[in-house]
Amino acid sequence: MAILAFQKPDKVLMLEADNFFGKFEFRPLEPGYGITIGNALRRILLSSLEGFAITSIKIDGVDHEFGTIPGVIEDVTNIILNLKQVRFKHIVDDIENEKVSITVSGSEVFKAGDIGKQLTGFEILNPDLVICRLDPTASFQIELTINKGRGYVPADENRDPNADIHVIAIDSIFTPIRNVKYSIENFRVEQKTDYEKLVLEIATDGSIHPKEALKEAAKILIHHFMLFSDEKIAIETADTEGNEEFDEEVLHMRQLLKSKLADMDLSVRALNCLKAADVETLGELVKFNKNDLLKFRNFGKKSLTELDELLESLNLSFGMDITKYKLDKE
């Protein structure tokens, strides 16, 4: 049975955007879908995007985070709090973690930009952030470890049991998202005024463009929902021997091939011809060659061209071998 069409946006409107802030609009949406989509995207954006942060430090002569450094105004606890605010932008694909050793001396202020001078794979986005202040005659050696992560990770999870005893693990804020908020307004479509418009505002630390952050969050949601949309879902026992695993591409293709032709934007003539031949899904359609279709009753070249364009837009083709997608095992 065909699913009734939903009122949904043709595209996402980017009202304004720079490296630190983006404002996006989704319209029209069915009643209730504004909060459904807005809340889901907000939670994913705030908690699940990857970023880079300092995960541990080592300071010569300091054994724990409650220590002090001679000639330095801030104690180690405050230095750590400042280091947690340093924001990194990934600039070299092959480098996803980096350890850097810095000698701080001959200066009254140690800033985040001084860390950036020693880095290879990262750029510091807030170079003016003050890490600590010290006497011009004071000096100390600090080693920083930068890693890739997701969301917020406490110091206990960053602690390496094999690390040197003087290494201090710290809390890490990996998320590149500063804030996300959304609002929902009424939107009119023809004579109906109860549709919704979702406005989503995303603030980042500059390491990712808001547009890319939104795309990444949507991708994470899609990957999770893909499993639930697959009709092969079944309750499994603890014995999983013989169960087959499918990668994401196969799962996506299975779902696509099971799509009903009645839900596609096809002419009535083409749909009636296919229905008369008991061809109801994309999977059933792509099994045929073009010559086979032309043998269908009342099926002409115009309908063939229409179907050919549809399959091409979906990266499908006539005569495909779809046995590996196991559509028959439902």
UniProtKB/Swiss-Prot annotation:
Pfam families: RNA_pol_A_bac, RNA_pol_A_CTD, RNA_pol_L. It comes from the Bacteria. SMART domains: RPOLD. Residues 1-231 are annotated as: Alpha N-terminal domain (alpha-NTD). Keywords: DNA-directed RNA polymerase, Nucleotidyltransferase, Transcription, Transferase. Its EC number is 2.7.7.6. GO terms for molecular function: DNA binding; DNA-directed RNA polymerase activity; protein dimerization activity. InterPro entries: DNA-dir_RNA_pol_insert (IPR011262), DNA-dir_RNA_pol_RpoA/D/Rpb3 (IPR011263), DNA-dir_RpoA (IPR011773), RBP11-like (IPR036603), RNAP_asu_C (IPR011260), RNApol_insert_sf (IPR036643). Transmembrane segments: none annotated. Residues 253-330 are annotated as: Alpha C-terminal domain (alpha-CTD). GO terms for biological process: DNA-templated transcription. One of its GO terms (cellular component) is cytoplasm. It catalyses: RNA(n) + a ribonucleoside 5'-triphosphate = RNA(n+1) + diphosphate. It is an enzyme of class 2 (transferase). DNA-dependent RNA polymerase catalyzes the transcription of DNA into RNA using the four ribonucleoside triphosphates as substrates. The N-terminal domain is essential for RNAP assembly and basal transcription, whereas the C-terminal domain is involved in interaction with transcriptional regulators and with upstream promoter elements. HAMAP family: RNApol_bact_RpoA. Homodimer. The RNAP catalytic core consists of 2 alpha, 1 beta, 1 beta' and 1 omega subunit. When a sigma factor is associated with the core the holoenzyme is formed, which can initiate transcription. Belongs to the RNA polymerase alpha chain family. This is DNA-directed RNA polymerase subunit alpha. It comes from Parabacteroides distasonis (strain ATCC 8503 / DSM 20701 / CIP 104284 / JCM 5825 / NCTC 11152). The lineage of its organism: Bacteria, Pseudomonadati, Bacteroidota, Bacteroidia, Bacteroidales. The gene is rpoA.
